[in-house]
Regions:
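Proteins that catalyze or organize thiol-disulfide redox chemistry
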Residues: 1-78, 83-95, 99-140
Length: 140
């Protein structure tokens, strides 16, 4: 019985680690202000949970965060639930969802992203803006 309980615990821990996200949640204004405009650049997705386009983007954005996970000290991949934080959405002057912006280090001025919603295109944009290469293999 003890072995069965231990095995269940191990499986639960493995599942939790496997589901860990590298996308930093900055929905709280204090968290956003502590990251954006500081020493690392930040790619931020402003989303709403009910938004269909946001839901379709989520897996691509997760892969983007995975591709830059080892470079978190230089570039952060983050998200903000702008529906939950209308004050921050108003401050950024959002007009639709999802809104994707890259904030250079030490800057509150975001560069909007309007390209394809693929991991590859997003990674290329982040690399272009930050000069930081992702861990994604180059296109064939």
């Amino acid at each position: 019985m003890h072995a069965m309980w231990l095995w269940t615990l191990v499986l639960a821990l493995v599942a939790a680690v496997a589901q860990a996200s590298h996308v930093l949640d900055l929905t709280q204004t204090a968290d956003y202000d502590a990251v954006v405009g500081k020493s690392a650049g930040a790619m931020v997705e402003f989303f709403a949970p009910w938004c269909g386009h946001c839901k379709r983007l989520a897996p691509e954005y997760e892969k983007l965060a995975d591709a830059f996970a080892k470079k978190k000290d230089k570039v952060v991949i983050a998200k903000v639930d702008a529906d939950a934080n209308r004050e921050l959405a108003d401050r950024i002057k959002l007009s639709g969802f999802p809104t994707l912006m890259y904030f250079p280090p030490n800057s509150q001025q975001g560069v909007p992203y309007n390209g394809p919603r693929t991991t590859e295109a997003l990674a290329e944009f982040v690399t272009q803006q930050s000069q930081i290469k992702s861990s994604m293999p180059p296109p064939a």
